């Protein structure tokens, strides 16, 4: 039977990513696998905002640090024995499949999909699509056309995210 030993889950603070994270926790527990929770701050966005907001980098890093800390706590409390977190700066489309997958020796990458429409995907592409195309290992994209009505995020709550929004 095929088992996964090192699962990488990409999170970005969206409810879709948290839904995928919950599934990654289940897969990690079933396989007794290491779970690496990653967040990549898109440096292209960062460079365009730097001129307008000198604190953007610090806010982004604090958001990501707290997000990853929350996910690590949830996974550990759910029974995942080996949970690591990684924060990177750069293009998520390149860093996740080409750098992080190798760095953590992932044999499965999991991610959510944000539900971009066809025009948006054509213009900006999707991170999940890039991961599928460039990954050296299996990829599971958790599709969610619409989150279940009873879904309540534990980490990426609206209240959590509002702490980091510009006022």
Curated annotation (Swiss-Prot):
Protein name (record): Putative universal stress protein SSP1056
Subcellular location, principal: cytoplasm
Domain of life: Bacteria
CDD domains in the cross-refs: USP-like (cd00293)
Keywords of the record: Cytoplasm
Key word Methyltransferase present: no
A GO CC term assigned to this protein in UniProt: cytoplasm
């Amino acid at each position: 039977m095929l088992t996964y030993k090192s699962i990488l889950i990409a999170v970005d603070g969206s409810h879709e990513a948290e839904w995928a994270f919950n599934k990654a926790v289940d897969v990690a527990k079933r396989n007794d696998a290491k779970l690496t929770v990653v967040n990549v701050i898109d440096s292209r966005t960062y460079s365009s905002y730097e001129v307008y907001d000198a604190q953007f980098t610090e806010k982004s890093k604090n958001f990501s640090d707290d997000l990853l800390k929350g996910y690590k706590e949830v996974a550990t409390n759910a029974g995942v024995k080996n949970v690591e977190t990684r924060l990177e700066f750069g293009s998520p489309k390149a860093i996740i499949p080409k750098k992080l997958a190798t760095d953590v020796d992932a044999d499965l990458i999991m991610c959510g999909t944000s539900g971009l429409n066809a025009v948006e995907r054509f213009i900006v592409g999707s991170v999940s699509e890039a991961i599928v195309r460039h990954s050296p290992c299996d990829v599971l994209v958790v599709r969610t056309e619409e989150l279940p009505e009873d879904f309540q995020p534990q980490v990426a709550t609206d209240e959590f995210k509002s702490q980091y929004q510009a006022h």
